Amino acid sequence: GSNRMPVHPDLIDLAKNGDTDAVKLMMKWGYEGSKKFIGGNPVEKIIQSPRDIREILAVDLIACNNYTNGSNAARLIDCPSLLIFGSLDKMVNLESGKKFSSLIKNSTTHIIEGCGHMIMIEKAFEMRDKVLEFLK
């Protein structure tokens, strides 16, 4: 589940039009804003064409922007849950993440320092270790 994740209308418009700037802007905000990728941007390797941007990224951004039931859904979660946030995330700021975590019964929150929104790309080993620790 997720809480409300508003997306700037200009970013949605770029994605709907298949503009490659949509991917670049999303990654600038999502990946700690300044790091360079070894071997190139992984999202640009997945979303390669204007059609991909329209059919994958735009649909995802619109879904994030329009979803409004996160708080209600979170209150219904009734199993141990781990929420991992990046301290530098500009897409889901830390305060919003903590508020969302507080809605889930029996939840554990872990903050990965020096990490943005793309936790699995930025800090894969730390994330993996925290998930394994939680599952034990």
Map each language-model feature to its residues.
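Glycosyltransferase donor-binding loop in the core domain
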Residues: 15, 89-92, 116-119
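Residue-level signal for the nucleotide or nucleotide-sugar donor/cofactor binding architecture
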Residues: 52, 92-95, 122
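Short alpha-helix in the alpha/beta-hydrolase fold that links the catalytic acid
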Residues: 79, 93-102
